[in-house]
Amino acid sequence: MKTAFPAAWFVTGTDTEVGKTFSCCALLHVLRNQGLQAVGMKPVAAGVDAQGRNEDVEALMASASVAAPRALVNPYLFAAAIAPHIAAAEQGVRIELAPILSAFHALRAQADVVLVEGVGGF
């Protein structure tokens, strides 16, 4: 579908808990109401609940109009609710760009619009 919306947006904020996920979910609802296939992506997340899920990732998935696999929506998930680069180091994981780009391109193939939510703040 041809759209006046950009094909991808990056959403960032000045800190954690400032409304990035809330804003992404609101935008996903607007895009869905415009008849667009839209999906959220949080490439790197930290902090999981008892079921091993991240609340931001779950909110993005619930708001999307595309049922994308969790592994594409969130390629890197760390259990500890700390800065992702620290959590990655503690788990011996190196956050690589290639898996993130691969997931992004797979989502772009399924949706008119992809909203990418950054971690923390800048």
Language-model segments: residues:
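N-terminal phosphate/diphosphate-binding loop that engages ATP/GTP or pyrophosphate donors
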Residues: 3-8, 22-94, 98, 103-106
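Hydrophobic anchor at the beta1->P-loop junction of P-loop NTPases
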Residues: 11
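Conserved glycine-rich cofactor-binding loop
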Residues: 15
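Conserved glycine(s) of the Walker
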Residues: 18-19
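Switch II (G3) loop of P-loop NTPases
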Residues: 100, 104-122
